[in-house]
Amino acid sequence: MSQSYQHILVAIDESPISYAAVEQAKCLAQDLQAKLTIMSVIAVDPFVGVDFYKVAPAITDYFMQAESHAQNRLNEIQANLARENLSAQVKLIRGVTPSEGIIHVADEVGADLIMMGSHGRTGLQKLMLGSVAQNVLTQSPIPVLIVKA
């Protein structure tokens, strides 16, 4: 049984492997004439509700800068794809875990394939935060294609 995907969702972070996923998705979308959505998640702020948060405006600035940087990167990817005559929608989700955000957006846009890098974080961050790719693989009701470096 062959599957022809109609709408591909690509989840990115700041890792080089996620940009490789965009390149793979671009080729697949062109071959299949599929819609393409590129997304990023600004995760739940771990300092919400902590007294320290009130005295640390730098933390608020950090999240505002992270959001601005993510939106700029999405816009840059969208513009690069447009130069190659490929239209892509971009989405930035805030305040949820990455895996929840990815699955939510896939449902929201009607994606029938999720593409993402095999990992974004390494070392202790990966251990503490868990594997986003593994969580999406486990929870997604649609196929997930993991891109390796």
Question: What are the functions of these language-model segments?
Answer:
Residues 1-3, 76-114:
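Structural beta-alpha unit
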Residues 2-57, 80, 84-89:
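Small/aliphatic-rich secondary-structure junction motif
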Residues 21, 70-73, 98:
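Hydrophobic alpha-helical membrane-association signature
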Residues 21, 48-51, 100-103, 126-128:
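Short, well-ordered secondary-structure micro-motifs
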Residues 27, 104-149:
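Gly/Ser-rich helix-loop-strand patches that form or flank binding pockets
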Residues 40, 92-94, 148:
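Residue-level recognition of beta-strand->loop/alpha-helix junctions
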Residues 57-72:
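A short acidic, glycine-rich active-site loop
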